[in-house]
C-alpha cells in the first residue's frame, strides 16, 4: 500500500469565533510534520448545527487560496446517516455546492454513519451526480467512509470488495458512534478497544488495496496538580498499536497529534537502513546469478523482499508529497539510496 494517509486530520470548518475559519485555515497552511496527509474540513460533528452553512461557505472561500500550496489531499466530511433522511438530504446539498464551487481543488468527500453496501452505493452516487453537474471528469472525486454503525460493520467485506471497482478509497473507524449504536459501556474509565474490528478493517482494506484509518483519540489533555498537559503518550500508544496491525493511518484532532502520527507511521531510520541493506544485497546476489539468497542469516525470497520494498515505497510516497519531512528525518545518503534503489519485486 503506497497511497499515503498517515494522518486524517479533521478541522471544524466553522467555529463560533470572529474568524470562524480559523481551524480550517490553520490546517491548510500547516508546515513540516504538522502537515497532514489528508485534511478533512469538518461540516458534520465538528461544526455546530447553526453553523453548517457557514462551514460550507468557509470551504468555498478558503480552499482556492490554499489548495495549490497544500501538499496533501482535501476531503470535506459532509453530513450523512443511513437512518436519517434529513441528514442525507443535507449531505447531498453540501456535496453539490462544494463540487460546483471548488470541485477542482478537492480530492473527494468523507461520508459518516454509512449503513450497508446499498447505502455506500447511494453515497457514491451522490458524488457522481455532483461531479457530472459540475462538469468535472468522471472519477475526479474520491470517497472515504466512516465505519461507525452496526450495518456498516456487518457489510465490511462487501463494502471493501465494492471499492475495487468504485471511487471508494478509504475506510475510517468511528469508535464513539459505533460503541453507542451497539450499546457498549465505558467501565472503569476504559472504552472498548474493538481489536477484532480493527484487525478485520486492516485485512479487508488490504485485500481491496484501499487505506484503513484508525479512530480518534479525544483525551488530548490531562490535568494534574493544577497543571494541564498534552497527552502525548496516550495518543502515541494508540497510533503505534494501529501501525502494528497494519492500519495505514491515524485520525488526528490536533496539530500535535498530526506530528506524532506522521512520525510513527513513517519508517524509522533503523528500518530504512535494515531493509535497504537487504534489498541491495539481494539485488547484487541476483546480478551475480545466485539462486537462493541469504542476507545476514535470513533467507530472502520474493515474499520477504516485498516486505522490505514496502518500507522503501512508503518513504518514496512521503518524499514525493512531503519532501521537507523526509529530508528532516533521514540523512542525505540514506534518503538518496531509498530514492535510487531498484525494486525487483513489489
Curated annotation (Swiss-Prot):
Organism: Haloarcula marismortui (strain ATCC 43049 / DSM 3752 / JCM 8966 / VKM B-1809) (Halobacterium marismortui)
A molecular-function term among this protein's GO annotations: malyl-CoA lyase activity
Protein family membership: Belongs to the HpcH/HpaI aldolase family.
Binding site for substrate: 176-177, 253-254
CC cofactor note: Divalent cations such as magnesium or manganese.
Pfam families to which the protein is assigned, alphabetical: HpcH_HpaI (PF03328)
Binding site for Mg(2+): 148, 177
Enzyme class: lyase
Function description: Involved in the methylaspartate cycle. Catalyzes the reversible cleavage of beta-methylmalyl-CoA to propionyl-CoA and glyoxylate, as well as the reversible cleavage of (S)-malyl-CoA to acetyl-CoA and glyoxylate. In addition, it has a small malyl-CoA thioesterase activity. It can also catalyze the cleavage of (S)-citramalyl-CoA to acetyl-CoA and pyruvate.
Reactions the enzyme catalyzes: (S)-malyl-CoA = glyoxylate + acetyl-CoA; (2R,3S)-beta-methylmalyl-CoA = propanoyl-CoA + glyoxylate
InterPro entries linked to this entry: Aldolase/citrate-lyase_domain, Pyrv/PenolPyrv_kinase-like_dom, Pyrv_kinase-like_dom_sf
Coiled-coil region(s): none
Entry keyword set: Lyase, Magnesium, Manganese, Metal-binding
Chain's gene name: citE1
Cofactor requirements of the protein: Mg(2+); Mn(2+)
GO BP terms, alphabetized: oxaloacetate metabolic process
Protein name: L-malyl-CoA/beta-methylmalyl-CoA lyase
Enzyme Commission (EC) number: 4.1.3.24
Amino acid at each position: 500500500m503506497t497511497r499515503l494517509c498517515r494522518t486524517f486530520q479533521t478541522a471544524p470548518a466553522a467555529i463560533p469565533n470572529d474568524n470562524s475559519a480559523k481551524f480550517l485555515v490553520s490546517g491548510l497552511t500547516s508546515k513540516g510534520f504538522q502537515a497532514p496527509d489528508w485534511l478533512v474540513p469538518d461540516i458534520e460533528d465538528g461544526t455546530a448545527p447553526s453553523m453548517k452553512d457557514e462551514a460550507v461557505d468557509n470551504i468555498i472561500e478558503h480552499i482556492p487560496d490554499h489548495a495549490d500550496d497544500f501538499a496533501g489531499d482535501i476531503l470535506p466530511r459532509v453530513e450523512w446517516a443511513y437512518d436519517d433522511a434529513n441528514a442525507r438530504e443535507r449531505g447531498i446539498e453540501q456535496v453539490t455546492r462544494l463540487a460546483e464551487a471548488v470541485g477542482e481543488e478537492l480530492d473527494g468527500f468523507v461520508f459518516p454513519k454509512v449503513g450497508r453496501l446499498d447505502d455506500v452505493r447511494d453515497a457514491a452516487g451522490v458524488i457522481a451526480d455532483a461531479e457530472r453537474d459540475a462538469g468535472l471528469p468522471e472519477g475526479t472525486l474520491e470517497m472515504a467512509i466512516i465505519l461507525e454503525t452496526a450495518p456498516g460493520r456487518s457489510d465490511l467485506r462487501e463494502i471493501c470488495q465494492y471499492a475495487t471497482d468504485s471511487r471508494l478509497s478509504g475506510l475510517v473507524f468511528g469508535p464513539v458512534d459505533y460503541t453507542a449504536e451497539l450499546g457498549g459501556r465505558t467501565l472503569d474509565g476504559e472504552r472498548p478497544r474493538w481489536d477484532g474490528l480493527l484487525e478485520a478493517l486492516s485485512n479487508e482494506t488490504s485485500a481491496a488495496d484501499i487505506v484503513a484509518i484508525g479512530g480518534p483519540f479525544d483525551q488530548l489533555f490531562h490535568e494534574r496538580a493544577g497543571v494541564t498537559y498534552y497527552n502525548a503518550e496516550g495518543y502515541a500508544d494508540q497510533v503505534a498499536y494501529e501501525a502494528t496491525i497494519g492500519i495505514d493511518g491515524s485520525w488526528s484532532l490536533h496539530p500535535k497529534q498530526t506530528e506524532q502520527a506522521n512520525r510513527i507511521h513513517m519508517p524509522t531510520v533503523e528500518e530504512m537502513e535494515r531493509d535497504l541493506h537487504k534489498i541491495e544485497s539481494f539485488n547484487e546476489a541476483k546480478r551475480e546469478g545466485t539462486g537462493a539468497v541469504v542476507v545476514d542469516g535470513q533467507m530472502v525470497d520474493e515474499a520477504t523482499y516485498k516486505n522490505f520494498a514496502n518500507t522503501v515505497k512508503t518513504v518514496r510516497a512521503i518524499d514525493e508529497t512531503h519532501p521537507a519531512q523526509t529530508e528532516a528525518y533521514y540523512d542525505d545518503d540514506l534518503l538518496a539510496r531509498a530514492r535510487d534503489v531498484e525494486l525487483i519485486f513489489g
